[in-house]
Curated annotation (Swiss-Prot):
Coiled coil: none annotated. One of its GO terms (cellular component) is plasma membrane. The chain crosses the membrane at residues 4-24, 33-53, 62-82, 93-113. Pfam families: DUF1516 (PF07457). Belongs to the UPF0344 family. This is UPF0344 protein RBAM_010920. Keywords: Cell membrane, Membrane, Transmembrane, Transmembrane helix. InterPro entries: UPF0344. The lineage of its organism: Bacteria, Bacillati, Bacillota, Bacilli, Bacillales. Its main location: membrane.
Length: 118
């Protein structure tokens, strides 16, 4: 299940950049399609993350913090795409998104079921 989870968030990150770029270049139809596919990947990420949480959690704060950071990351991804679609500025959101994404990945790698890079 860990591989499904990692694959789904990697694909979701790619789709965020594709959707963002398509909305920026004015290709609304392609952007709408990729955005809907991205939303399906949000659901997959949440379901696989919840399954990992229930199966492997020692019910401590690190797992709960990782889950909270993951949900915030998904929220920021959606906010980036929507604000770009509406033509609003996204500078501050990009900074917050990158910070939360890095924290989420680092915490995920630190937990026992993550890949042990450090």
């Amino acid at each position: 299940m860990t591989h499904w989870h990692i694959t789904s968030w990697v694909v979701a990150l790619i789709l965020v950049f594709v959707s963002y770029g398509l909305y920026g270049s004015g290709k609304a139809k392609g952007a709408k399609i990729t955005h809907m596919i991205l939303r399906l990947f949000y659901i997959i990420i949440i379901l696989t993350g919840a399954e990992l949480f229930v199966r492997f959690a020692n019910w401590n704060g690190e797992y709960a913090g990782k889950m909270l950071l993951g949900i915030i990351t998904i929220g920021l991804m959606e906010m980036l795409v929507i604000r770009k679609k509406k033509g609003k500025s996204t500078g501050g959101l990009w900074i917050g998104f990158i910070i939360v994404l890095v924290l989420t990945v680092l915490l995920g790698l630190h937990l026992p079921i993550g890949f042990h890079v450090f």
